[in-house]
């Protein structure tokens, strides 16, 4: 109870700090007041981009039961196994509804009728984030679509415009010795720990006397939760079936980004690219 209350405070405080907007194109769960038997399958939410703090989680989804109140579904957030190795932090994650980002865990929760969030681009996408680009590590990532097909659960893209501007990272120039060392560590850290070494920074303080901090920049954030894409239940999807439904998903992410970039006055946002 204490954690839920604390989460609500964090959410309200963040909403007061950021010019944040949430657009939900459809209700994800059954209509209010209507129960179904058997219970409906859950929904897999693909969150984009990863960014460095994944703001839509803390602003709109996790705290205070807001997601369940709006959509009638329990929410579970999938995260790397490494996060569950840290004492005390593990208890916080469990209390907030986090689960391990494994195929069995995701599929079990979808079959149980829960909404499951997954930041598909992972550590590689976080390392690629910059103010002047919006690159999603999504072109070859199809495992989440396979989970949805095996569970027969729809998939809804959640795209946040402005996420690449609120926390930035120190980017060392090509040829810099320290940059070469950190880039060499990327594959090892990503493969064995699930994250990559990044040096983040936020807004300056005291008129620039403190040139950087951990406080995010006050950039406008527009989070769009798209309409769920229905998925057939296929216990063992073929590569052709997987590719087909993955392309549907990419098209929907592109539609959301390009539509709301102009509709919400964010025309200066960089071009969306699917990489890796």
Regions found by a protein language model. Name each.
Residues 1-9, 37-112, 122-140, 180:
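Catalytic core of membrane glycerolipid acyltransferases/transacylases, capturing the structured
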Residues 11-38:
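A short, well-structured juxtamembrane/interface segment
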Residues 13, 91, 146:
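Surface-exposed charge patches
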Residues 15-17, 70-72, 150:
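Short, well-ordered coil/turn elements that cap or connect secondary structure elements
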Residues 20-22, 77, 272:
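Generic structural signal for residues in well-ordered beta-strands
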Residues 22-32, 62-64, 102-106, 132-133, ...:
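Eukaryotic intrinsically disordered and solvent-exposed regulatory patches
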Residues 108-276:
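Non-catalytic C-terminal accessory region of glycerolipid acyltransferases
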């Amino acid at each position: 109870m204490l954690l839920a209350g604390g989460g609500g405070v964090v959410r309200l405080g963040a909403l007061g700090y950021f010019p944040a907007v949430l657009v939900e194109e459809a209700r994800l769960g059954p209509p209010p007041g209507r129960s179904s038997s058997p219970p409906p399958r859950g929904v897999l939410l693909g969150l984009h981009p990863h960014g460095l703090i994944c703001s839509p989680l803390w602003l709109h989804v996790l705290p205070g039961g807001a997601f369940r109140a709006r959509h009638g579904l329990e929410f579970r957030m999938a995260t790397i196994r490494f996060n569950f190795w840290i004492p005390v932090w593990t208890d916080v994650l469990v209390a907030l509804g986090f689960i391990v980002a494994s195929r069995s865990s995701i599929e079990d929760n979808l079959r149980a009728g829960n909404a499951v969030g997954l930041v598909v681009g992972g550590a590689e996408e976080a390392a690629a984030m910059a103010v002047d680009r919006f690159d999603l590590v999504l072109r070859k990532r199809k495992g989440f679509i396979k989970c949805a097909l095996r569970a027969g659960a729809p998939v809804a893209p959640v795209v946040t415009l402005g996420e690449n501007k609120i926390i930035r990272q120190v980017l060392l120039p090509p040829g810099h010795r320290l940059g070469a060392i950190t880039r060499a560590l990327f594959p090892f850290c990503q493969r064995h720990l699930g994250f990559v070494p990044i040096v983040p920074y936020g807004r300056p303080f005291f008129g620039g006397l403190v040139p950087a901090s951990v406080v995010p920049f006050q950039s406008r954030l527009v989070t769009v939760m798209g309409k769920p894409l229905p998925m057939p239940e296929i216990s063992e999807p073929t590569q052709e079936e997987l590719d087909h439904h993955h392309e549907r998903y990419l098209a929907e992410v592109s539609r959301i980004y390009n539509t709301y970039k102009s509709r919400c006055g964010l025309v200066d946002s960089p071009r969306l690219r699917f990489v890796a």
